[in-house]
Amino acid sequence: MSFNTRRMLNMTKREAVIVGVADLPLKDGKVLAPMSVLQAQALVARDALKDAGIPMSEVDGLLTAGLWGVPGPGQLPTVTLSEYLGITPRFVDGTNIGGSAFEAHVAHAATAIEAGRCEVALITYGSLQKSEMSRNLAGRPAVLTMQYETPWGMPTPVGGYAMAAKRHMHEYGTTSEQLAEIAVATRKWAALNPAATMLSLIHI
Protein backbone atom coordinates (compact mmCIF):
# COMPACT_ATOMS: atom_id res chain seq x y z
CA MET A 1 0.00 0.00 0.00
CA SER A 2 1.26 3.46 -0.80
CA PHE A 3 0.15 7.05 -0.46
CA ASN A 4 1.68 10.23 -1.78
CA THR A 5 1.16 13.54 -0.03
CA ARG A 6 2.18 16.93 -1.28
CA ARG A 7 1.89 20.33 0.29
CA MET A 8 -0.55 22.95 -0.92
CA LEU A 9 -0.02 26.60 -0.03
CA ASN A 10 -2.72 29.03 0.94
CA MET A 11 -2.63 32.50 2.40
CA THR A 12 -2.29 31.34 6.01
CA LYS A 13 -0.30 28.13 6.29
CA ARG A 14 1.12 25.08 4.55
CA GLU A 15 -1.39 22.26 4.22
CA ALA A 16 -0.67 18.64 3.33
CA VAL A 17 -3.00 16.79 0.97
CA ILE A 18 -3.10 13.22 -0.35
CA VAL A 19 -2.73 13.42 -4.11
CA GLY A 20 -1.91 9.85 -5.12
CA VAL A 21 -2.84 6.36 -3.91
CA ALA A 22 -1.92 2.85 -5.06
CA ASP A 23 -2.29 -0.73 -3.90
CA LEU A 24 -0.78 -3.98 -5.10
CA PRO A 25 -3.08 -6.05 -7.37
CA LEU A 26 -4.18 -9.20 -5.54
CA LYS A 27 -6.08 -12.39 -6.32
CA ASP A 28 -7.73 -14.21 -3.43
CA GLY A 29 -5.77 -11.91 -1.15
CA LYS A 30 -2.41 -12.95 -2.59
CA VAL A 31 0.05 -11.25 -4.94
CA LEU A 32 -0.17 -12.26 -8.59
CA ALA A 33 3.52 -13.11 -8.90
CA PRO A 34 6.28 -14.04 -6.43
CA MET A 35 8.11 -10.97 -5.15
CA SER A 36 9.83 -9.55 -2.10
CA VAL A 37 8.37 -6.91 0.19
CA LEU A 38 10.96 -4.52 -1.22
CA GLN A 39 9.76 -5.16 -4.76
CA ALA A 40 6.13 -4.80 -3.69
CA GLN A 41 6.78 -1.44 -2.05
CA ALA A 42 8.69 -0.20 -5.08
CA LEU A 43 5.81 -1.13 -7.38
CA VAL A 44 3.16 0.66 -5.34
CA ALA A 45 5.47 3.65 -4.88
CA ARG A 46 5.76 3.91 -8.66
CA ASP A 47 2.00 3.59 -9.12
CA ALA A 48 1.14 6.13 -6.39
CA LEU A 49 3.47 8.69 -7.93
CA LYS A 50 2.00 7.99 -11.36
CA ASP A 51 -1.48 8.51 -9.90
CA ALA A 52 -0.31 11.83 -8.47
CA GLY A 53 1.50 12.91 -11.62
CA ILE A 54 4.73 13.44 -9.67
CA PRO A 55 8.13 12.11 -10.79
CA MET A 56 10.17 10.00 -8.39
CA SER A 57 12.90 12.65 -8.47
CA GLU A 58 10.64 15.10 -6.57
CA VAL A 59 10.21 12.81 -3.55
CA ASP A 60 12.11 14.29 -0.61
CA GLY A 61 10.27 12.52 2.21
CA LEU A 62 9.99 8.75 2.74
CA LEU A 63 7.97 6.96 5.40
CA THR A 64 7.92 3.18 5.28
CA ALA A 65 7.23 0.07 7.35
CA GLY A 66 6.27 -3.53 6.85
CA LEU A 67 7.32 -7.14 7.29
CA TRP A 68 10.69 -7.02 5.55
CA GLY A 69 11.85 -10.57 6.19
CA VAL A 70 14.20 -12.00 8.77
CA PRO A 71 14.96 -9.10 11.10
CA GLY A 72 18.55 -8.16 11.76
CA PRO A 73 20.39 -5.52 13.79
CA GLY A 74 21.33 -3.64 10.62
CA GLN A 75 17.82 -3.54 9.17
CA LEU A 76 17.15 0.01 7.97
CA PRO A 77 13.99 -0.02 5.80
CA THR A 78 14.11 3.70 4.94
CA VAL A 79 17.71 3.45 3.75
CA THR A 80 17.13 0.20 1.85
CA LEU A 81 14.02 1.48 0.06
CA SER A 82 15.61 4.87 -0.69
CA GLU A 83 18.56 3.16 -2.35
CA TYR A 84 16.26 0.80 -4.26
CA LEU A 85 14.16 3.71 -5.57
CA GLY A 86 17.21 5.84 -6.30
CA ILE A 87 16.13 8.77 -4.12
CA THR A 88 17.82 10.83 -1.41
CA PRO A 89 15.07 12.06 0.93
CA ARG A 90 15.76 14.77 3.51
CA PHE A 91 13.02 13.45 5.81
CA VAL A 92 12.57 9.77 6.68
CA ASP A 93 10.40 7.89 9.17
CA GLY A 94 10.66 4.14 9.77
CA THR A 95 8.26 3.95 12.72
CA ASN A 96 6.69 0.47 12.66
CA ILE A 97 3.60 -0.11 14.78
CA GLY A 98 2.39 -3.07 12.75
CA GLY A 99 -0.30 -3.21 10.10
CA SER A 100 -1.57 0.28 10.83
CA ALA A 101 1.85 1.92 10.48
CA PHE A 102 0.90 3.67 7.25
CA GLU A 103 -2.02 5.37 9.01
CA ALA A 104 0.33 6.88 11.58
CA HIS A 105 2.70 7.81 8.76
CA VAL A 106 0.01 9.93 7.10
CA ALA A 107 -0.12 12.09 10.22
CA HIS A 108 3.68 12.16 10.46
CA ALA A 109 3.99 13.15 6.79
CA ALA A 110 1.42 15.92 7.14
CA THR A 111 3.28 17.32 10.14
CA ALA A 112 6.60 17.18 8.27
CA ILE A 113 5.18 18.92 5.21
CA GLU A 114 3.46 21.63 7.23
CA ALA A 115 6.70 22.22 9.14
CA GLY A 116 8.65 22.58 5.89
CA ARG A 117 10.77 19.47 6.44
CA CYS A 118 9.80 18.07 3.05
CA GLU A 119 7.64 18.90 0.03
CA VAL A 120 6.65 15.49 -1.35
CA ALA A 121 6.25 12.59 1.10
CA LEU A 122 6.00 9.01 -0.12
CA ILE A 123 4.40 6.53 2.29
CA THR A 124 4.69 2.78 1.74
CA TYR A 125 3.74 -0.31 3.70
CA GLY A 126 4.30 -3.90 2.66
CA SER A 127 3.60 -7.37 3.99
CA LEU A 128 3.37 -10.66 2.11
CA GLN A 129 2.28 -12.79 5.06
CA LYS A 130 -0.78 -14.27 3.36
CA SER A 131 1.02 -14.80 0.06
CA GLU A 132 3.81 -16.66 1.87
CA MET A 133 1.70 -18.72 4.27
CA SER A 134 3.12 -21.92 2.81
CA ARG A 135 6.66 -20.91 3.77
CA ASN A 136 8.27 -21.64 7.08
CA LEU A 137 8.55 -18.41 9.05
CA ALA A 138 12.30 -18.90 9.41
CA GLY A 139 12.58 -19.20 5.65
CA ARG A 140 11.39 -15.69 4.88
CA PRO A 141 13.63 -13.64 2.57
CA ALA A 142 16.43 -11.91 4.43
CA VAL A 143 16.83 -8.16 4.28
CA LEU A 144 19.65 -6.88 2.08
CA THR A 145 21.93 -6.11 5.01
CA MET A 146 21.98 -9.80 5.91
CA GLN A 147 23.20 -10.65 2.40
CA TYR A 148 25.64 -7.86 1.63
CA GLU A 149 26.90 -6.42 4.91
CA THR A 150 26.72 -8.96 7.74
CA PRO A 151 28.98 -11.55 6.02
CA TRP A 152 31.70 -8.90 5.70
CA GLY A 153 31.91 -8.09 9.39
CA MET A 154 29.07 -5.61 9.94
CA PRO A 155 26.56 -7.51 12.10
CA THR A 156 25.57 -4.47 14.19
CA PRO A 157 24.62 -0.83 13.50
CA VAL A 158 28.04 0.32 14.79
CA GLY A 159 29.67 -0.58 11.47
CA GLY A 160 27.06 1.45 9.61
CA TYR A 161 27.70 4.45 11.84
CA ALA A 162 31.41 4.14 11.14
CA MET A 163 30.81 4.10 7.39
CA ALA A 164 28.56 7.17 7.64
CA ALA A 165 31.20 8.98 9.70
CA LYS A 166 33.92 8.06 7.21
CA ARG A 167 31.80 9.35 4.36
CA HIS A 168 31.14 12.63 6.20
CA MET A 169 34.89 13.03 6.73
CA HIS A 170 35.49 12.39 3.03
CA GLU A 171 32.76 14.79 1.84
CA TYR A 172 33.27 17.68 4.25
CA GLY A 173 36.75 17.28 5.70
CA THR A 174 35.35 16.52 9.15
CA THR A 175 38.00 15.36 11.62
CA SER A 176 37.80 12.55 14.16
CA GLU A 177 38.26 15.15 16.90
CA GLN A 178 35.19 17.05 15.69
CA LEU A 179 33.12 13.87 15.68
CA ALA A 180 34.43 13.05 19.15
CA GLU A 181 32.86 16.28 20.41
CA ILE A 182 29.47 14.64 19.83
CA ALA A 183 30.32 11.81 22.23
CA VAL A 184 31.67 14.27 24.79
CA ALA A 185 28.52 16.42 24.67
CA THR A 186 26.22 13.39 24.72
CA ARG A 187 27.92 11.97 27.82
CA LYS A 188 27.83 15.37 29.55
CA TRP A 189 24.07 15.68 29.08
CA ALA A 190 23.43 12.03 29.96
CA ALA A 191 25.40 12.43 33.20
CA LEU A 192 22.84 14.98 34.37
CA ASN A 193 20.54 12.01 34.96
CA PRO A 194 21.56 10.43 38.30
CA ALA A 195 20.24 7.09 37.05
CA ALA A 196 22.43 7.14 33.93
CA THR A 197 24.57 4.06 33.27
CA MET A 198 27.68 6.15 32.65
CA LEU A 199 28.20 9.10 35.01
CA SER A 200 31.88 9.81 34.42
CA LEU A 201 32.65 12.52 31.87
CA ILE A 202 34.89 11.85 28.89
CA HIS A 203 37.40 14.19 27.29
CA ILE A 204 39.19 14.44 23.99
Residue ranges of each PLM-predicted region?
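Glycine/charged-rich beta-loop-alpha catalytic/anionic-binding loops adjacent to active sites
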Residues: 26, 85-95, 142-151
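Glycine-/small-residue-rich "gating" segment that lines the acyl/pantetheine channel
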Residues: 134-168
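Conserved small/polar residues in nucleotide/adenosyl-binding loops
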Residues: 203-204
